[in-house]
């Protein structure tokens, strides 16, 4: 018995292998299985064909592994992807059990029980079709949840830290604070329990004043008015209150503060007290603000220049107040300087000229003036133009992050202006001193305008505090409008991609929405892409339509940066940050993720949106904690990482730094952190260029798209005629035709005479229009396809004459000719001709006039056919008459007028013919019946031997008067009864006799297999695939791997790229990577897979499952087909957070090979790892 593995449900078991050998085949005679129909073997994975039997029997039932299940079955120990009935295996690291039901059939998979969530999980993430996962671990205290790794401030003087693994809060006392340290929270200010970090403003002010121990007096601004107790390691909150105190007679020496801004803005809720108390506070604040304004105007101070209301955002780091330094100065008898409390970044201080302390910062400062020390001198001091108002806060007045909000495009911190009497209002105070920088003012006011657009979605109601100048109001207005336009444009692009109607926005009250324009332009790009045409820029569309059209045509999607959770380093009790430690830190970090110690989803800021058009020349791509620049196609990034130059142009040397910039920073101390100087964007709105603008060395350089050349003016572009300049790539036998920006190659054609080649086709030549005809004068040229003909111009026909007016008139031949008619005829003129009419001559009956009309001659009625002799009569002419006689076999009728036939058969019945007598006109004829032949005498009949004439194509039997034809086996008698036609057994038993191809032969049939890749089995009907790889009949080289497919094989080469080492036959692992980006973006492992499928597979069908091994809680993957799916046959889908599949979404109807590169990115514990699966997919016809 020989076993044969066949797919489950094979309908015909004729697959006996040829492995029986020649000896066995010779011993067992071939069994004739004609007409035998074998029953289908349902769910059979192992078959056997007994010697001499026509039908196979099932040895074992089971399930056949299909698609991506094939690899799971192999890993489960089931050879060749066949699972016996009743057995099972595990996938997805034991989370799913796949089993084959009793009796075989389809494999069904069932998820196992979900694992328990880890302890200290404060937030569970539920994903469809997946187990719940822990989204965040942390601590639970007094009914509130705190994220792991965060330090929070619990009033009045406690700082509590949640460990990285969660659990219980670790609390300690804040240094220098003398409050109540009981754990009871009954005395806490009213907390909004939907946000455990949000407190009411009024109570926070009271507690902050209490914690100061009397340092802050009634006239001071309460720093706590802006928010709740702070999370020491978290984000920051926009400054919500800047209140000016009554200006003292003696000003203390101020501390300069430069704020760069906090991370993404968050919102804090505040409750209000009674209406009476609010009105009193507002009146008091108005008086205080008026006092500050008057004092600023009188003394020429810069006011709050050191505290811009908004500024670019930066990373957040915890800091401490340098209280020891201030205490030392107070003990020495000097007037204490105001302390600057920062809520985001560490501060480095340096003392500049005139004792001014510079405090560069990356956070927002809350300013509170301290009261003068009792006993200090109060003599008036003339304000210095360098003095800057600065205030101090208690150490515990940190501003924490409130609850996270859904991430939006990150913009500048919240600083919109509400009402003049609002105690939480923020005004953009312009710089009034000569040293004030207009550029800084524009940035500050622009940020306020953007924030107003974010909060209010309009730009018409921006309030004016009365202190802004025209520069600030202009910047606010234009930045607000620009943000709304960009937002509406992005919405229009998304609407076009979702197939929405590109209509105007209903809520466009300002009339600045770009929704319809961007939607229409994106629709243009999508249509070009759908038609399969190349995506080319069209500068005539203008900005942003050209950019939007090109982006949608090329299918560019916004970069989606995954949210990365990085647990912070465990922090001990707050310590003092020295100046030396902070001196070397950067003011604005745009580095890698390692510079974000407390990164959680939503903490990252999009620097590309914060500084649009300033960071990169072409494209700015935001990353977690940083950004990087990219260039348009045809350009390369320069060494500075932000500017682009056309490919092929040498890099321009960097412009030397302006001396003015050097002198501007010469006054800053060595430990002051300089701010990055934004480069001017000379290519904004494409600059002066018509096509491509590039910034090189601070100047705009124009270049052109491929196929164009720069003109003499340096900004315009003209088309290059590649056909004339010999820049085309047309081969021999082709001719070049120039187009705008490119060219086309047309195959050279030889046209027949009369045709000329045009646009690759032979077109007719109009010889008449070109004047190349050969028509003589007096002829008119008429063009035809491939030729022409000459048509004579108008002339008169015969019998007409042209008059002087060109008209044709009749000629009277009777008068113009001398003798138009013969003698005896008269001339009669007609139109265009004439006739001759005989002269009248009267003759008797039976006579007519002679040719000359002079005499009468006899009419021969028998020759002219004017006689009236009947059928069977003979005409004899007589002078002036004729006579009718009867023919032989006829006789006259009883009246003697006509002739009738004599019926000889009736006159002598049975005596004239042996078989049949047939009467004819004037005679008779003898005939014989079928099968007989008339004898020579014309009367007798003789039998005919039809078989001698070989009328039958095969066998013949003669009988008396007839014959009978017979056919051999395998033939049948045709309808004519003579011909034997072959019986087409293949047509009668279509699909039953042979599994692949049935060849009809005379009298029988033969089964055939494909010429290559298959061999005939012992039953002579079915075909079996030849495994060339196992038999060694392939032609693959030693460096290639043979892979068998149905009916053929493929030679695959598994080579590892540079910087990779081959760890197995189909796996390559990366050896090293030079930097973080290369480690993140280059694949850590490259694995080759081979998949075989049959054509006509129903879609959608999962063909491959992919995921990390092993998987851990919190793992997240993203799949993407980066190569080989240009025709869209395949797609990717996630089954759960850590498992995805590649599926067939378009039916493959013909044999075809695919080579896919599937990239999987794994997010695990804050890091990203890339894996690459190279899949060789082969679709073949059904098994034979």
From Swiss-Prot:
The keyword Disulfide bond applies. The keyword Protein transport does not apply. Residues 178-444 are annotated as: Subdomain NB (Cys-free). Residues 221-293, 399-437 are annotated as: Disordered. O-glycosylated with core 1 or possibly core 8 glycans. It is unsure if the O-glycosylation is on Thr-347 or Ser-348. Residues 28-444 are annotated as: N. The modification Phosphoserine is found at residue 277. Residues 445-480, 488-519, 521-553 form the Anaphylatoxin-like domain. Residues 604-645, 679-718, 719-763, 764-809, 810-857, 858-900, 901-942, 943-981, 982-1024, 1025-1069 form the EGF-like domain. GO terms for biological process: positive regulation of cell-substrate adhesion. It is found in: Secreted, Extracellular space, Extracellular matrix. Residues 1-27 form the signal peptide. InterPro entries: Anaphylatoxin/fibulin (IPR000020), cEGF (IPR026823), ECM_structural_protein (IPR050751), EGF-like_Ca-bd_dom (IPR001881), EGF-like_dom (IPR000742), EGF-type_Asp/Asn_hydroxyl_site (IPR000152), EGF_Ca-bd_CS (IPR018097), FIBL-2_dom (IPR056612). Gene3D superfamilies: Laminin (2.10.25.10). Belongs to the fibulin family. Homotrimer; disulfide-linked. Interacts with LAMA2. Interacts with FBN1 (via N-terminal domain). Forms a ternary complex with ELN and FBN1. This is Fibulin-2. It comes from Homo sapiens (Human).
């Amino acid at each position: 018995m020989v076993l044969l593995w066949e797919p489950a449900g094979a309908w015909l078991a004729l697959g006996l292998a040829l492995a029986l050998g020649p000896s066995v085949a010779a011993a067992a005679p071939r069994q004739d299985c004609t007409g035998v129909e074998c029953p289908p073997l349902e769910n059979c994975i192992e078959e056997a064909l007994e010697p001499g039997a026509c039908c196979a029997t099932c040895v074992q039932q089971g399930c056949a592994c299909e698609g991506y299940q094939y690899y799971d079955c192999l890993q489960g120990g089931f050879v060749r992807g066949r699972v016996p009935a009743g057995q099972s295996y595990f996938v997805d690291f034991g989370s799913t059990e796949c089993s084959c039901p009793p009796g075989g059939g389809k494999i069904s998979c069932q998820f196992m029980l979900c694992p328990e969530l880890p302890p200290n999980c404060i937030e569970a993430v539920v994903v469809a079709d997946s187990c719940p996962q822990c989204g965040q671990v942390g601590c639970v205290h007094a009914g509130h949840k705190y994220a792991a790794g965060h330090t929070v401030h619990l009033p009045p003087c406690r700082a509590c830290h949640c460990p990285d693994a969660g659990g219980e809060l670790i609390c300690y006392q804040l240094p220098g604070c003398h409050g109540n340290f009981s754990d009871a929270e009954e005395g806490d200010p009213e907390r909004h329990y939907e946000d455990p970090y949000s407190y009411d403003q009024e109570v926070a002010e009271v507690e902050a004043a209490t914690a100061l121990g009397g340092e802050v007096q009634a006239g001071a601004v309460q720093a706590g008015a802006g928010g709740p107790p702070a999370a020491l390691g978290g984000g920051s909150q926009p400054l919500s209150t800047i209140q000016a105190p009554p200006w003292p007679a003696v000003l203390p020496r101020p501390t300069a503060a430069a704020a760069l801004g906090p991370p993404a803005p968050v919102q804090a809720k505040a409750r209000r007290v009674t209406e009476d108390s609010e009105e009193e506070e507002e009146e008091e604040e108005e008086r205080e603000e008026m006092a500050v304004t008057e004092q600023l105007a009188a003394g020429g101070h810069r006011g709050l220049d050191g505290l811009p209301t908004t500024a670019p955002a930066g990373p957040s780091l915890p800091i401490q107040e340098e209280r020891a330094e201030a205490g030392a100065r107070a003990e020495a008898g000097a007037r204490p300087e105001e302390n600057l409390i920062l809520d985001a970044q560490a501060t480095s201080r340096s003392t500049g000229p005139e004792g001014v302390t510079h405090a560069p910062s990356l956070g927002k400062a809350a300013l509170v003036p301290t009261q003068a020390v009792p006993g200090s001198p109060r003599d008036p001091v003339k304000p210095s133009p360098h003095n800057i108002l600065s205030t101090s806060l208690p150490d515990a007045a940190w501003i924490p992050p409130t609850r996270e909000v859904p991430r939006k495009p990150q913009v500048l911190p919240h600083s919109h202006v509400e009402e003049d009497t609002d105690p939480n209002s923020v005004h953009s105070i312009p710089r009034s001193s000569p040293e004030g920088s207009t550029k800084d003012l524009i940035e500050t006011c622009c940020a306020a305008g953007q924030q107003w657009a974010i909060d209010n979605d309009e730009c018409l109601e921006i309030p004016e505090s009365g202190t802004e100048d025209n520069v600030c109001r202009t910047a606010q207005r234009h930045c607000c409008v620009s943000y709304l336009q960009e937002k509406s444009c992005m919405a229009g692009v998304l609407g076009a991609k979702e197939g929405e109607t590109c209509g105007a926005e209903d809520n466009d009250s300002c009339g600045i929405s770009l929704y319809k324009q961007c939607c229409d332009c994106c629709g243009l790009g999508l249509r070009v892409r759908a038609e399969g045409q190349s995506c080319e820029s069209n500068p005539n569309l203008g900005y942003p339509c050209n950019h939007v059209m090109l982006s949608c045509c090329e299918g560019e999607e916004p970069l989606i940066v995954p949210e990365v959770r990085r647990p912070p380093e465990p922090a001990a009790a707050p310590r003092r940050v020295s100046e030396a430690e902070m001196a070397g830190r950067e003011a604005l970090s745009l580095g890698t993720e390692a510079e974000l110690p407390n990164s959680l989803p939503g903490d990252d800021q999009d620097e590309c949106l914060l500084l649009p058009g300033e960071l990169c020349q072409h494209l700015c791509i935001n990353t977690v904690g940083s950004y990087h620049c990219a260039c348009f196609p045809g350009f390369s990034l320069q060494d500075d990482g932000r500017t682009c130059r056309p490919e092929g142009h040498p890099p321009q040397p960097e412009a030397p730094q302006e001396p003015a910039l050097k002198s501007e920073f010469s006054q800053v101390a060595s430990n002051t952190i300089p701010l990055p100087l934004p480069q001017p964007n000379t290519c904004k709105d494409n600059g002066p260029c018509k096509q491509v603008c590039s910034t090189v060395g601070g100047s705009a350089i124009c270049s052109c798209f491929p196929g164009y050349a720069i003109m003499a003016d340096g900004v315009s572009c003209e088309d290059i005629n590649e056909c004339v300049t010999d820049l085309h790539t047309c081969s021999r036998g082709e001719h070049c035709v120039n187009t705008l920006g490119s060219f086309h190659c047309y195959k050279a054609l030889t046209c027949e005479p009369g045709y000329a080649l045009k646009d690759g086709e032979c077109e007719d030549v109009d010889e008449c229009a070109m004047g190349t005809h050969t028509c003589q004068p007096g002829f008119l040229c008429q063009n035809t396809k491939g030729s022409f003909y000459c048509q004579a111009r108008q002339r008169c026909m015969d019998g007409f004459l042209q008059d002087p007016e060109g008209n044709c008139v009749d000629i009277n031949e009777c008068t113009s000719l001398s003798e138009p008619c013969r003698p005896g005829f008269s001339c009669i003129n007609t139109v265009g001709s004439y006739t001759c009419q005989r002269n009248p001559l009267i003759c008797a009956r039976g006579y007519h006039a002679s040719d000359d009309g002079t005499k009468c001659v006899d009419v021969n009625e028998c020759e002219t056919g004017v006689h009236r002799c009947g059928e069977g009569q003979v005409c004899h002419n007589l002078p002036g008459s004729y006579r009718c006689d009867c023919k032989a076999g006829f006789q006259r009728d009883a009246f003697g007028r006509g002739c009738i036939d004599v019926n000889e058969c009736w006159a002598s019945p049975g005596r004239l013919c042996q078989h049949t007598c047939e009467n004819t006109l004037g005679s008779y004829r003898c005939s014989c019946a079928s099968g007989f032949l008339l004898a020579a005498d014309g009367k007798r009949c003789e039998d005919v031997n039809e078989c001698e004439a070989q009328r039958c194509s095969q066998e013949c039997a003669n009988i008396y008067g007839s014959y009978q034809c017979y056919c051999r086996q395998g033939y049948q008698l045709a309808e004519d009864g003579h011909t034997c036609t072959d019986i087409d057994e293949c047509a009668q038993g279509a699909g039953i006799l042979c599994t692949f191809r049935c060849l009809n032969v005379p009298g029988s049939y033969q089964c055939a297999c494909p010429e290559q890749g298959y061999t005939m089995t012992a039953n002579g009907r079915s075909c079996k695939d030849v495994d060339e790889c196992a038999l060694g009949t392939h032609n693959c080289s030693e460096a290639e791997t043979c892979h068998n497919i149905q009916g053929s094989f493929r030679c695959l080469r598994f080579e590892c790229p540079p910087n990779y080492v081959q760890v197995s036959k189909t796996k390559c692992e990366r050896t090293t990577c030079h930097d973080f980006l290369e480690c993140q973006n280059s694949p850590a492992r490259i694995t080759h897979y081979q998949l075989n499928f049959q054509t006509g597979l129903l879609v959608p069908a999962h063909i491959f499952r992919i995921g990390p091994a092993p998987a851990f809680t919190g793992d997240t993957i993203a799949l993407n087909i980066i190569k080989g799916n240009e025709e869209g046959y395949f797609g990717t889908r996630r089954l759960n957070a850590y498992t995805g599949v590649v599926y067939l979404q378009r039916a493959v109807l013909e044999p075809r090979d695919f080579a896919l590169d599937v990239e999987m990115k794994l997010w695990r514990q804050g890091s990203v790892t890339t894996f690459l699966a190279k899949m060789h997919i082969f679709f073949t016809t059904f098994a034979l």
